[in-house]
Amino acid sequence: MRAWTGLVMLGLLAACKPADKPPADETAVPSAPPVPEAKADGPAAATTAVALDAEGLRFIDKASGKASLLAFGVPREQAEKALANVAGKADDRSDNNECGAGPMAFTRFDAMTLNFQDGKFVGWFLGNEKGAKDYSTASGIGIGTTRAKAKQSVTITDIEDSTLGEEFSIGTGDTVVGGMFAEPGDAAKVDALFAGANCFFR
């Protein structure tokens, strides 16, 4: 009897054993997670565009074309409020006390980062991230613009021996927008744009 009971228990355990998983399809390509869209949900997002400028950021009324400059030197609170009105709530704020230009604070709105020193707006940096397509210069240059296309509307000055890579500038004197191409050549695309004071280590 005891032997029969043991056989029954072995049978139950075998029945409860999970089935072997089917072999994974080795040819299947893992899918990348979807990239979230930029917010651009500020109250003025539908009516206002933001243009990149060597002197700050220009806010342009889409209906009338009227532009107003958010100039370097304005208080941090004013700059943050102006951009949030279009880009939506800031993603984060941070600080770096070891920047080449001196201690600096930052407020990031998707691809756009505003730079501050002593509580004043002193620069901006646009990276190749979500939301970058919402910004361009008055001449239409933005992230993803090729060197060949940019040269049709502005003069591109390459920064020789730059430690930042394929660095270039647009403009002269104090009214310069800087940038970086992803690689050499006319087919290279703009990978970053910036103006004013930035946290670069050259």
Predicted regions and their residues:
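Short helix/turn-capping signatures at newly exposed starts of structured segments
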Residues: 17-164, 186-202
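Sec-dependent signal peptide recognition
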Residues: 2-8
